[in-house]
Design a protein with these regions (language model features):
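Bacterial N-terminal signal peptides that target proteins for export
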Residues: 1-17
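Bacterial N-terminal signal peptides
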Residues: 14-26
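Acidic/histidine-rich, surface-exposed loop or edge segments in extracytoplasmic proteins
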Residues: 49-68, 136-138
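Zn2+-dependent metallopeptidase catalytic core
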Residues: 63-106, 153, 163
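Short alpha-helix carrying the canonical HExxH Zn2+-binding catalytic motif
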Residues: 144-157, 161
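Gly-Asp-aromatic-enriched flexible segments
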Residues: 287-425
Length: 425
């Protein structure tokens, strides 16, 4: 409900001295982030800041009433999602100053740190935490953000974490999860992992850049608010770990432990899976797009592979709506193998079923790739090769043969059907 507009006095912030101060800053960019550009500071029609309330938020903003209420709805929906993920209901109202035009705000009405971040086109979350006997007994956060879509949600994730856990975790987790919270559209449910819904500039930047290693992201001395580019890498890692079933079961407990200051680390949690995570992380960076689902593109590290023979060929069932799947076959470079296929699949809800040869455009064709370890012990892939309805093929490398239905990686979800593949010498 909208209340009467009021002038926000700076005296409140003079009393907002804290026992412990935690500051987390959102990404600031004047060029790459189209939805987080510098706030227009040119003269504008007067729009005195007003207060708008919902169950979990109090926002002071110069946005028009309709836009302010829409923002409240988006914030409340996001809060349901993140509180469900972390299994911790919000404890207290999150207060936000959301600025559309600085010209509408009287001098001194914004905290200097908040105003500085808003001037730069980003935002900041200031939190105070009160301890007693080493235990957190109270926490309060205030958000300052531009009204550009995305920044208030990002900062609200920081505020929620600070108020409910007393901290936001290390930078890679704090900023990566804040970007995830901003991008989440639906409550995560078992069996229905999240698809990629980030901004287009994130995809374009990552796909065109030299990847940052896991070590660079997790163990660097980067600080919050450093660059929008670093935020992209942190989001990518958190999205992979949170939505890929190979790693998600460990990721949520790790995050909760980081938020509650338990003696844990990324290396302790995933040390035994380092090679696999590094491989899937780089694979994700090369192939993701809007709609990409890590659960459908996860790699199978559990299936046992062995060499086939002419008497008993190895059989596998390859689903159309998944990425590379285990054939169970170990192949040797240069050797020929017999292959047969049975069944049909399709690559869209309304498309016709096709065999392993695919359609006229090549979609739906049975494809192969070989996974092997290089001299450094890291996983690598051969060039993908077409199998279709062939009755023989030559292995391009020695290793584990994986198969899939050819389709765009971010469009697998609407595929259906499966093909049985038998391979022998």
């Amino acid at each position: 409900m909208e209340s009467a507009a009021r002038i926000i006095k700076p005296a409140f912030f003079r009393s907002f001295l804290v026992l412990a101060l935690l500051v987390t800053v959102s990404v600031t960019s004047l060029n790459a982030q189209g939805n987080r550009r510098t706030v227009n500071q040119r003269p504008a029609s007067p729009a005195a800041p007003a207060d708008y309330r919902s169950k979990n938020f109090l926002i002071h903003t110069d946005l028009p009433a309709e836009e302010a209420r829409d923002l409240l709805e988006r914030l409340e929906k996001m809060l349901v999602i993140i509180s469900t993920y972390w299994a911790s209901p919000n404890r207290s109202v999150i207060e936000c100053y959301v600025v559309k035009d600085l010209a509408n705000w009287p001098a001194g009405s914004l905290h200097p740190a908040g105003m500085q971040s808003v001037e730069g086109g980003g935002g900041v979350t200031m939190s105070r935490t009160t301890y007693r006997g080493g235990q957190i007994i109270a926490a309060k956060s205030i958000v300052y953000a531009t009204a550009n879509k995305g920044t208030p949600q990002h900062e609200a994730v920081h505020a929620y974490c600070a108020q409910n856990f007393g901290r936001t975790g290390p930078v890679w987790y704090s900023e990566g999860m804040a970007e995830m919270g901003n991008n989440w559209k639906v409550v995560p449910r078992k069996g229905q992992p999240l698809a990629v819904t980030c901004e287009r500039y994130v995809i374009d930047y990552i796909r065109q850049s030299e990847p940052k290693s896991l070590n660079e992201i997790v163990n660097s001395r980067d600080t919050t608010g450093d660059s929008w580019q670093n935020y992209c890498w942190r989001w990518a890692l958190c999205h992979l770990l949170a939505t890929n079933p190979n790693y998600s079961a460990r990721f949520r407990p790790l995050g909760l432990a980081l938020l509650t200051n338990k003696p844990v680390s990324f290396d302790q949690t995933y040390g035994s899976m380092d090679k696999e995570i590094s491989f899937e992380y780089l694979f994700f960076l090369r192939h993701f797009d809007q709609g990409y689902r890590c659960d459908l593109c996860q790699w199978d590290w559990k299936t046992k592979f062995r060499k086939p023979n002419s008497v008993r060929p190895l059989s596998s069932k390859i689903e159309a709506n998944q990425g590379w799947q285990a054939s169970r076959v170990l192949v040797e470079e240069g050797q020929e193998y017999q292959i047969s296929t049975f069944g049909e699949w399709n690559t869209a809800t309304e498309s016709k079923d096709v065999t392993a040869s695919g359609d006229d455009s090549g979609r739906g064709t049975l494809m192969g790739v070989v996974l092997y370890e290089n001299e450094a012990g890291d996983y690598e892939l051969s060039e993908a090769f077409e199998l279709g309805n062939a009755d023989r093929f030559e292995a391009p490398a020695s290793g584990k043969l994986f198969l899939r239905c050819r389709d765009n990686w971010h469009e697998l979800a609407d595929n259906s059907g499966k093909i049985t593949v038998k391979i022998g010498e």
